[in-house]
Design a protein with these regions (language model features):
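Short beta-strand-to-loop elements that line the ligand-binding cleft
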Residues: 30, 51-62
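Short, hydrophobic alpha-helical packing/hinge segments within bilobed ligand-binding/sensory domains
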Residues: 65-67, 84
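Flexible hinge/capping segments at coil-to-helix
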Residues: 1, 5-31, 46
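C-terminal effector-binding regulatory domain of bacterial HTH transcription factors
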Residues: 81-86, 90, 100-149
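Ligand-binding cleft/hinge of the Venus flytrap
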Residues: 22, 39-53
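Paired acidic/hydrophobic, glycine-rich loop segments that form the ligand-binding mouth/hinge
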Residues: 75-79, 95
Length: 149
């Protein structure tokens, strides 16, 4: 899952958005990704998906740079929960508009000839359980954690 977050300093200076429709009025930190339209955040609230066009003073194609800018109080970021979890728990970042999120998949990639390997099966199952346990992933694979060719 990806969530919206910002530093307490940023929120103190500029306020906290109370609704998704307010995001375009805030400085957002955008990651340039190959397969995604620039500055369009597709967010779910559990029942529906909304697309929102955001802009901001800075953009990067490197997620860790955007993460650091967020910590530095430069704007609102859309980051993977596993990436910002510790910062949220320590108070360095604040989870904003918590009812909204973006789905994010984690893939285990391996060659077809290893699909039936017990080691691969055990490793993938371990990762599925780990991410479910530690990061609240609803489903870490498209087929429920089972391997298929």
């Amino acid at each position: 899952r990806r969530i919206l977050c910002a530093s307490p300093d940023f929120l103190q200076r500029y306020g906290t958005p109370k609704a998704l429709s307010e995001l375009p009025g805030f400085a957002c930190l955008v990651i340039k990704e190959r397969d995604h339209p620039f500055g369009i955040w597709r967010l779910h609230n559990g029942t529906e998906e909304q697309s929102i066009k955001v802009t901001g003073p800075m953009a990067s194609n490197h997620g860790e740079i955007v993460h650091q800018w967020c910590l530095d109080g430069q704007g609102i970021a859309l980051r993977s929960y596993w990436d910002v979890k510790d910062n949220i728990h320590s108070g360095k970042l604040v989870h904003i508009l918590p009812e909204y999120f973006q789905s994010a998949n984690i893939w285990a990639v391996y060659v077809t000839r290893l699909a039936m390997s017990a080691k691969v099966r055990v490793s993938v199952e371990f990762l599925r359980r780990y991410f479910n346990e530690h990061y609240g992933a609803e489903n870490t694979s498209a087929n429920g954690g089972t391997l298929k060719r």
